[in-house]
Structure formats: structure tokens, C-alpha cells
Curated annotation (Swiss-Prot):
Organism for this UniProt entry: Enterococcus faecalis (strain ATCC 700802 / V583)
GO CC annotation terms, alphabetical: cytosolic large ribosomal subunit
Gene of this entry: rplY
Domain of life: Bacteria
Name of the protein in its database record: Large ribosomal subunit protein bL25
Keywords: Ribonucleoprotein, Ribosomal protein, RNA-binding, rRNA-binding
Function: This is one of the proteins that binds to the 5S RNA in the ribosome where it forms part of the central protuberance.
Subunit structure and binding partners: Part of the 50S ribosomal subunit; part of the 5S rRNA/L5/L18/L25 subcomplex. Contacts the 5S rRNA. Binds to the 5S rRNA independently of L5 and L18.
Length: 202
């Protein structure tokens, strides 16, 4: 699936122009890659926010730059640490027929039998590297943990193959495990050492 983002070209200098754009609710950005020279652009922050909210970060974003209609992926976004405002975004122009690699979120599905029995869920990977043509890139990878008992674990190798994409993360990497809940050790009675004052010789 792809969505359209309206962008406009911008000047690189003066530097104050970028701050002015941000003040107006716009985001300075750059697009580069397949069949396009590195080009500075800008767009309305609310437009990209809506795309990410409704379609995710791995969706193909169409835009028109220098009279060309191109397909892009958002490759990097710089956010303000305190406000979350977009400060700068990089878009990678892609060939829709060539394989592209991205990170996809690991989404756990269900409640494991082991957790219901008192175990603890330990998730070791939160994203995995996947490869696919841009139109087939997944936003997330679903992992069903319903049947996991205490002591069970799932690795990348345990995931079913998917016809649309390939998972490139090491097959031996552990995704999730169900471990016994840790309990605080109880103090044994009588183990506390009592201090006695030495008897004084009369």
C-alpha cells in the first residue's frame, strides 16, 4: 500500500529558514536515492503524522519532486526530545521492484499458558530485520505466545515463513521466553546473629 505526501522544494540556506518552517508547522527534509539527486524539501508535519498514525513507518510514501513522481520510504526522523516535534526527516527513493531492508516491530499475540500459571514473560527482541519489495514490507511481525509454558522459548527460527517477506535476523536469536517468577528468599529463623557484650572479669 502507498500514500501521497505533498512536498515542496526548499533552499538549503539560510539556516534560519529551517527554524522558520518549523515555527509554521512544517518540517524540513531531504529525499535521495533511486533515480533522484539529493533534494531538500519540506512538508506539513500534520500530514506525515497522519500517515504514520494510520499506516505505520514502513508504508510507501509517494511524492512529486522536481516534476518526478517517486516512491519513498521514511529512513530517518529527528524528533525534539521534549516536545516530540519533527525536526528533520530523510526519505529514501526506492525501486518498487527491488528488495529493501527495514526494521519491523515484534508484536506478541495472546497470553501464554506459562504466564497464566505464574511464570514471567521475558521479551528479548522488539524489532527484527526484514527484506521485501517496498509494497510488501510489514509494519510488524506477529508472534503467537499462547501455547508457551514455563521454560519454553521462541527463536527467530521458530517463526513461520512468509511469502511476502524474509526475516534476516539471526535464526538463533531468542525472541521471547517464559521463565519462573523470581521470589524473594525468606529469612530463616535463628539465622540473625545476636551480639553479646563480653563479660568483664571481676
Amino acid at each position: 500500500m502507498s500514500v501521497q505526501l505533498e512536498v515542496k522544494e526548499r533552499a538549503i540556506r539560510p539556516r534560519s529558514l529551517r527554524n522558520q518552517l518549523r515555527h509554521e508547522g512544517k518540517v524540513p527534509a531531504i529525499v535521495y536515492g533511486y533515480q533522484i539527486e539529493s533534494t531538500p524539501i519540506y512538508f506539513e508535519e500534520k500530514d506525515l503524522s497522519k500517515i504514520l498514525r494510520e499506516h505505520g513507518a514502513n508504508t510507501v510514501i509517494k511524492m512529486t519532486v522536481d516534476g518526478k513522481n517517486i516512491n519513498t520510504l521514511m529512513s530517518k526522523a529527528q524528533l525534539d526530545t521534549f516536545t516530540g516535534q519533527m525536526l528533520h526527516v530523510e526519505f529514501l527513493s526506492v525501486n518498487m521492484k527491488e528488495t529493501t531492508e527495514v526494521e519491523a516491530e515484534v508484536q506478541l499475540i495472546g497470553e501464554s499458558a506459562g504466564v497464566k500459571a505464574g511464570g514471567t514473560l521475558a521479551q528479548n527482541l522488539y524489532t527484527v530485520l526484514v527484506a521485501a519489495t517496498p509494497d510488501k514490507l510489514p509494519e510488524s511481525i506477529e508472534v503467537d505466545i499462547t501455547n508457551l509454558e514455563i521454560g519454553d522459548a521462541l527463536t527467530i527460527a521458530d517463526l513461520p515463513e512468509h511469502k511476502d517477506y524474509e526475516i534476516l535476523t539471526d535464526p538463533e536469536e531468542q525472541l521471547v521466553a517464559i521463565v519462573e517468577a523470581q521470589t524473594a528468599p525468606e529469612e530463616e529463623e535463628g539465622t540473625a546473629a545476636e551480639t553479646t557484650e563480653p563479660e568483664l572479669a571481676e
